[in-house]
Amino acid sequence: MSGTAEFPGRIPAPYLEVGSSSFVELLGSVAPELLPGRRPLPPGDMGDAAPHGTTIVALRCNEGVVMAGDRRATQGNMISLRDIQKVFPADAYSLIGIAGTAGLGVEMIRLFQAELEHFEKLEGNALSLHGKANKLANMIRGNLGIAMQGLAVLPLFAGFDTDAPDAASAGRIFSYDVVGGIYEEREYDAIGSGSIFAKSALKKRFQSEVDATEATRLAIEALYDAADDDSATGGPDLTRKLFPTVFTATADGAKRVPDAEIEAVSRAVVAARLENPGG
């Protein structure tokens, strides 16, 4: 750090000021150009200038919540990436998945992770799950300008509510619109270009009493159906051994479902569809 002219190497004053516990607000005051929504862009629609991530699904289960995402990113009518990861742990008990402009989405996830960690370090306690969801809504509002130029990012947020009376009611799912509106979903939700097909699949198959293993299978079934009708969504790729990314958030924390388990479930789903293509 440059410090000041009087005391070279000293921490700059903005870092020592007492403010909020928000890392995003701190970054906005000391280096606003690093925030995605503050970067200058040329006029016009830039939606086809970068790869886009597609379909994410989340559903509640007896132990908490399951979130899954396909691995494809597209740019216009081309497949730009076949193995992108679009679902991540936000912190110890919550998950985030992104659809929309892939690069900005991954950057938003990293910034959101830093925001939650920064708050916990300063306050000594983690935000409530709803507080985390509201933090994410504020970040989306900050990106409204570039979203209007075709570089929108829409996340899906879910987690295990440690304040819930029991595990069966602890799984919560939050969706957003492009202006930062936040909506809690009761049972399941999906975002991205294949979301209408994924939600239709879950509407037929979802039951209120499912464990995490069954919820994982339902999520993969939903992504398979989305890929069947939406060219921007990638289904299980048996040839390349590329399968959906799946995370769970339970009382044990946010964990990735092992790749070997996802491969076994994906192969079982594909084999079943050979017998009954419509599921």
UniProtKB/Swiss-Prot annotation:
CDD domains: proteasome_protease_HslV (cd01906). Pfam families: Proteasome. GO terms for biological process: modification-dependent protein catabolic process; proteasomal protein catabolic process. Its EC number is 3.4.25.1. Coiled coil: none annotated. The active site is at residue 54. It is an enzyme of class 3 (hydrolase). Keywords: Autocatalytic cleavage, Cytoplasm, Hydrolase, Protease, Proteasome, Threonine protease, Zymogen. Its main location: cytoplasm. InterPro entries: Ntn_hydrolases_N, Proteasome_sua/b, Proteasome_suB-type, PSB_actinobac. Residues 1-53 form a propeptide. The formation of the proteasomal ATPase ARC-20S proteasome complex, likely via the docking of the C-termini of ARC into the intersubunit pockets in the alpha-rings, may trigger opening of the gate for substrate entry. Interconversion between the open-gate and close-gate conformations leads to a dynamic regulation of the 20S proteasome proteolysis activity. Pathway: Protein degradation; proteasomal Pup-dependent pathway. It is found in: Cytoplasm. GO terms for cellular component: cytoplasm; proteasome core complex, beta-subunit complex. Component of the proteasome core, a large protease complex with broad specificity involved in protein degradation. Belongs to the peptidase T1B family. This is Proteasome subunit beta. It comes from Stackebrandtia nassauensis (strain DSM 44728 / CIP 108903 / NRRL B-16338 / NBRC 102104 / LLR-40K-21). The lineage of its organism: Bacteria, Bacillati, Actinomycetota, Actinomycetes, Glycomycetales.
